[in-house]
UniProtKB/Swiss-Prot annotation:
GO terms for molecular function: 1-phosphatidylinositol-3-kinase activity; ATP binding; phosphatidylinositol kinase activity; protein kinase activity. GO terms for biological process: autophagosome assembly; autophagosome maturation; autophagy; cell division; cellular response to glucose starvation; early endosome to late endosome transport; endocytosis; endosome organization. Residues 149-170, 447-467 are annotated as: Disordered. Ubiquitously expressed, with a highest expression in skeletal muscle. The gene is PIK3C3. Its EC number is 2.7.1.137. This is Phosphatidylinositol 3-kinase catalytic subunit type 3. Residues 156-170 have a biased composition (Polar residues). Residues 759-780 are annotated as: Activation loop. It comes from Homo sapiens (Human). Catalytic subunit of the PI3K complex that mediates formation of phosphatidylinositol 3-phosphate; different complex forms are believed to play a role in multiple membrane trafficking pathways: PI3KC3-C1 is involved in initiation of autophagosomes and PI3KC3-C2 in maturation of autophagosomes and endocytosis. As part of PI3KC3-C1, promotes endoplasmic reticulum membrane curvature formation prior to vesicle budding. Involved in regulation of degradative endocytic trafficking and required for the abscission step in cytokinesis, probably in the context of PI3KC3-C2. Its cofactor is Mn(2+). The lineage of its organism: Eukaryota, Metazoa, Chordata, Craniata, Vertebrata.
Length: 887
């Protein structure tokens, strides 16, 4: 083989030098802008398009692979042009040959000046660095320039310099291929003929460029020569063909970070300088400008779950004196304080007393686990003292949970000292009963007489201070002092604390919290015992309630042990209730009903007691009231009612908030009280499941026409009943959506003869649902037909009520979120699954990121989606068949 026929090459991985590229000339004409364009855009006067001579263009070059840049761009140096653009400059790219992947391409963009500090692209072109056979490009190349765009480095590129049409059709491409073949030695070289040929080729190329509508950029790739021999650069990657083993299992290698969890000295120094005492006097008179004021207003409007950035914290601290007139800003300010720094904490506490008093509902946030400073928590208690008993009752369930974040030692120190002999007798009784001191039956604390008090405790120890404008009361002391003044508060406080004392999970998982609740119950019992006659009577009534509930639990256990069907169990239930000597439940001394202490009961009517068709067979009981009436309840044994209790409390609160806004949605927030983790009471509302209504009457409207007919009303139904139905539907649709209530079917939607629709059975909340693809809210075809269909006036009213209710509840979102934040550590099933996400789930339903108008449109889309949910209708039919086969 002759020397000329040999192919000399070098691998790209062995050529450890930077890639070089020569920018030659730019051929073609730029489209001139009209005078009209100059009038519309005066900045064109500064661009090259407005110049008579060639403008001062420059070229940038950047290497891309897979749409991502491999290095920073480089650009040509400044050069003044007169008649043609000719840079004739070699650019050294910041990437080496071994670093180039097979699909590397270079993007070239030509730029023109367009006003001060601004440039616009004249055009761009892209060309791959390796040919289709893996050879690095060499020699001269005319690249087609795509006008008015930057070069595109993605794959496939939108600005190809060598398009398919130019490679196969035009004269320039054909000549370029022949030139390449000549350069590679595939043609016989004749010097005199080659000179004539190349001159003719240049003339043809010039003619083609002038006749074309495109511009062309000439670039040259470096040739590699050694000993007068030209070498081609072939793409090659060492070990590129070797297969890489895929590990099916691996071990985590933990690398210790010596600086992990250590203090960031720079941030700490900045924090201390920003919060130093020296800045205090100067910050006192600071007033924000309009932009800063708007930013502060945005920060203040954040929901309680929002974490402030360091910049936002510094801004709030800087203008803390300005914000003292805004009560809503206090919680945001307290979030900015580093309580580990004594000077900063001292400044914050001094400012706390000067701040405009916050609203009672906002103070609940200060009782969450995020605020541990005792002064801040006592400030929140001081604000709670401004709430009346009715409002306090709405928050009492959460306030009992907030005791978990109090100082347990302070609660224990509030216990009054007793005589040694009495203490020893109590300990002896406990030891003789075989019960561990940590497992004392909490009900015994209130039912057993307490030993006498030896002497008044020191002032420093007692927490039973009179209500006043001070920060002396902690949360435990406050709750006990208010409960001693109101029998209803005392009733619910007792049962809420009893449930926590008897929670076996808490006792095993967190013994300190369990002991704390026992101490709360002991202090409550002491406070009741040392009160006046009416307070001591209150204590005896609570003891009587506990005894009554214990007997009722004993009765339910006896009924459940009874063999036989439901009829036999019913007979056994009525027989045991009638045996007053054995059970003593049908005729007792007058006591408050634990479920609703305003109702005084004398016992249970035996002959009316029945068991429901259910796995746990809850009992429907009718209590004899003081005035001779009947009060129906459901007593469940073997079921934890705390989740239902929470949801009904929130529904009751929402009903109160909506009524406060003059919006009565005819809700039915029936009462639920857990008397233990295994049993409790539910108020019974005379009603019919919607599924039964549809089976017996055919439709909801037929049901209403049967019990509330009216010739003048809509569809022959009383206007008042229809209005009640529409409003209750709207209220529960919005509320169950916000609370994420799941497992909705027509058997747990109940309907009264007065038109009230309401939900029961809240075993799935916060987005949990046993059914796949549930709709956002329970609103099916039958419910809409009960209003008269989607075209009826009642349905349009329903939609309006939904919008109004949603907007009102959004304004109280902080209160609702604060209540849920206090429940994150409660042993409630659907909260315990993901306690850290509980508040976020509720917050997401409020869509606080939307304006009121956007929120209305969002609610519209939810209603439409729910009405037309096809899969939900299929699931409802499956549930209906399942219920049929169970029967």
């Amino acid at each position: 083989m002759g020397e000329a026929e040999k192919f000399h090459y070098i691998y790209s991985c062995d050529l450890d030098i930077n890639v070089q590229l020569k920018i030659g000339s730019l051929e073609g004409k730029r489209e001139q802008k009209s005078y009209k364009a100059v009038l519309e855009d005066p900045m064109l006067k500064f661009s090259g398009l407005y110049q008579e001579t060639c403008s001062d263009l420059y070229v940038t070059c950047q290497v891309f692979a897979e749409g991502k840049p491999l290095a920073l761009p480089v650009r040509t140096s400044y050069k003044a042009f007169s008649t043609r653009w000719n840079w004739n400059e070699w650019l050294k790219l910041p990437v080496k040959y071994p670093d180039l992947p097979r699909n590397a391409q270079v993007a070239l963009t030509i730029w023109d000046v367009y006003g001060p500090g601004k440039a616009v692209p004249v055009g761009g072109t892209t060309v791959s660095l390796f040919g289709k056979y893996g050879m690095f490009r060499q020699g001269m190349h005319d690249l087609k320039v795509w006008p008015n765009v930057e070069a595109d480095g993605s794959e496939p590129t939108k600005t190809p310099g060598r398009t398919s049409s130019t490679l196969s059709e035009d004269q320039m491409s054909r000549l370029a291929k022949l030139t390449k073949a000549h350069r590679q030695g595939h043609m016989v070289k004749v010097d005199w003929l080659d000179r004539l040929t190349f001159r003719e080729i240049e003339m043809i190329n010039e003619s083609e460029k002038r006749s074309s509508n495109f511009m062309y950029l000439m670039v040259e790739f470096r040739c590699v020569k050694c000993d007068d021999k030209e070498y081609g650069i072939v793409y090659y990657e060492k070990d590129g063909d070797e297969s890489s083993p895929i590990l099916t299992s691996f071990e985590l290698v933990k690398v210790p970070d010596p600086q992990m969890s250590m203090e960031n000295l720079v941030e700490s120094k900045h924090h201390k300088l920003a919060r130093s005492l020296r800045s205090g006097p100067s910050d006192h008179d600071l007033k924000p400008n309009a932009a800063t004021r708007d930013q502060l207003n945005i920060i203040v409007s954040y929901p309680p779950t929002k974490q402030l950035t360091y910049e936002e914290q510094d801004l709030v601290w800087k203008f803390r004196y300005y914000l003292t007139n805004q009560e809503k800003a206090l919680t945001k300010f307290l979030k900015c304080v580093n309580w580990d720094l004594p000077q900063e904490a001292k400044q914050a506490l001094e400012l706390l007393g000067k701040w405009k008093p916050m609203d009672v509902e906002d103070s609940l946030e200060l009782l969450s686990s995020h605020y541990t400073n005792p002064t801040v928590r006592r400030y929140a208690v001081a604000r709670l003292r401004q709430a009346d008993d009715e409002d306090l009752l709405m928050y009492l369930l959460q306030l009992v949970q907030a005791l978990k974040y109090e100082n347990f030692d302070d609660i224990k120190n509030g216990l009054e000292p007793t005589k040694k002999d009495s203490q020893s007798s109590v300990s002896e009784n406990v030891s003789n009963s075989g019960i561990n001191s940590a497992e004392i039956d909490s009900s015994q604390i209130i039912t057993s007489p307490l030993p006498s008090v030896s002497s008044p405790p020191p002032a420093s120890k007692t927490k039973e201070v009179p209500d006043g404008e001070n920060l002396e009361q902690d949360l435990c002391t406050f709750l006990i002092s208010r409960a001693c003044k109101n029998s209803t508060l005392a009733n619910y406080l007792y049962w809420y604390v009893i449930v926590e004392c008897e929670d076996q999970d808490t006792q095993q998982r967190d013994p300190k919290t369990h002991e704390m609740y026992l101490n709360v119950m002991r202090r409550f019992s002491q406070a009741l015992l040392k009160g006046d006659k009416s307070v001591r009577v209150m204590r005896s009534l609570l003891a009587a309630q506990q005894t009554f509930v214990d007997r009722l639990v004993h009765l339910m256990k006896a009924v459940q042990r009874e063999s036989g069907n439901r009829k036999k169990k019913n007979e056994r239930l009525q027989a045991l209730l009638g045996d007053n000597e054995k059970m003593n439940l049908s005729d007792v001394e007058l006591i408050p009903l634990p479920l609703e202490p305003q109702v005084k009961i004398r016992g249970i009517i035996p002959e009316t007691a029945t068991l429901f068709k259910s796995a746990l067979m809850p009992a429907q009981l009718f209590f004899k009231t003081e005035d001779g009436g009947k009060y129906p309840v459901i007593f469940k044994h073997g079921d934890d009612l705390r989740q239902d209790q929470l949801i009904l409390q929130i529904i009751s609160l929402m009903d109160k908030l909506l009524r406060k806004e003059n919006l009565d949605l005819k809700l039915t927030p029936y009462k639920v009280l857990a008397t233990s983790t295994k049993h409790g009471f539910m108020q019974f509302i005379q009603s019919v499941p919607v599924a039964e209504v549809l089976d017996t009457e055919g439709s909801i409207q037929n049901f209403f026409r049967k019990y509330a007919p009216s010739e003048n009303g809509p569809n022959g139904i009383s206007a008042e009943v229809m209005d009640t139905y529409v409003k209750s539907c709207a209220g529960y649709c919005v509320i169950t959506y916000i609370l994420g209530v799941g497992d909705r079917h027509l058997d747990n939607l109940l309907l009264t003869k007065t038109g009230k629709l309401f939900h029961i059975d809240f075993g799935y909340i916060l987005g949990r649902d046993p059914k796949p693809l549930p709709p956002p809210m329970k609103l099916n075809k039958e419910m809409v037909e009960g209003m008269g269909g989607t075209q009826s006036e009642q349905y349009q009213e329903f939609r309006k009520q939904c919008y109004t209710a949603f907007l009102h509840l959004r304004r109280y979102s902080n209160l609702i979120l604060n209540l849920f934040s206090l429940m994150v550590d409660a042993n409630i099933p659907d909260i315990a699954l993901e306690p850290d996400k509980t508040v976020k789930k509720v917050q997401d339903k409020f869509r606080l990121d939307l304006s009121d108008e956007e929120a209305v449109h969002y609610m519209q889309s939810l209603i439409d989606e729910s009405v037309h949910a096809l899969f939900a209708a299929v699931v409802e039919q499956i549930h209906k068949f399942a219920q049929y086969w169970r029967k």
